[in-house]
Amino acid sequence: TLSSSSAASDVYKRQQYASAERVDVVGPKKTLTGVSILGPVRSATQVELSLTDARSIGVTAPVRESGDIAGSGACKLVGPAGEVELTEGVIAAKRHIHMTPADAEEYGVKDKDVVSVKVDTDGRSLIFGDVVVRVSDKYALAMHIDTDESNAAGCGRAQMGEIVK
C-alpha cells in the first residue's frame, strides 16, 4: 500500500511499517515524488492518494476501503528498481478507525460498524461521517484520515475525537 498522506510515517497498525524506500506516482498531468511505501507486502499493489493529489496528477481515485481496488484508477510507479504500469489500484482510502477488541468493547462498536466521529478544533470543528470501524488484535487505536480531511478540520498530529455514532 502506498500513501501520499503526511501521516504515512505514523503507521499505527502493529506489525506494519513505512519503508525507507520511496517511489514516484506518475499520472497524465504530473508526478508525485517521494511517496511512502507501506508494508508488509500485499497480494496486489494499491496506491492510496488524497483526492487532491489524485486530481492534481490526473488520475481517478474512488473512495474505497483498503483492498477494494477492482475497477479503480490507474497510474505508473517509478522507483530505484524500475517502473510498473498499474491498470488499477489507485484509491482514496475510506476514513476508518483501527482498534483492538478491547477498545471495541469499551466504545460499544464491532468490526465493520459505520460511525461518525466529532473532532473539536480551534475554529474548524466538524463531524466525520461514514467512518468504518476495523477491529483486530493487531491494531492500535487510531483513526485514519487523509491530508485533505485533516486539513479541513484543522487537526493536529495528536487530535482527539469522539465517536458519536
Question: What spans do the regions from the language model cover?
Answer:
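Conserved "landmark" site that anchors the functional core of diverse proteins
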Residues: T1, Q16-Y17, K29-L32, T60-G67, ...
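Glycine- and charge-enriched low-complexity intrinsically disordered segments
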Residues: M143-K165
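Ordered, amphipathic secondary-structure segments that act as subunit-interaction surfaces
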Residues: L32-P80, V84
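Short, small-residue-biased leader/transition segments that mark boundaries at the very start
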Residues: L2-Y12
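Short conserved beta-strand and strand-loop elements enriched in small hydrophobics
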Residues: E21-G27, A74-P80, K112-T121, Q159-K165
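Composition-driven recognition of glycine/serine/threonine/acidic- and proline-rich low-complexity segments
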Residues: Q15, R22-K30, L38-R42
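Extended, positively charged loop/linker patches that create polyanion-binding surfaces
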Residues: A61-V119
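Short, Lys/Arg- and Gly-enriched loop/turn segments at beta-strand edges
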Residues: G34, D122-V131
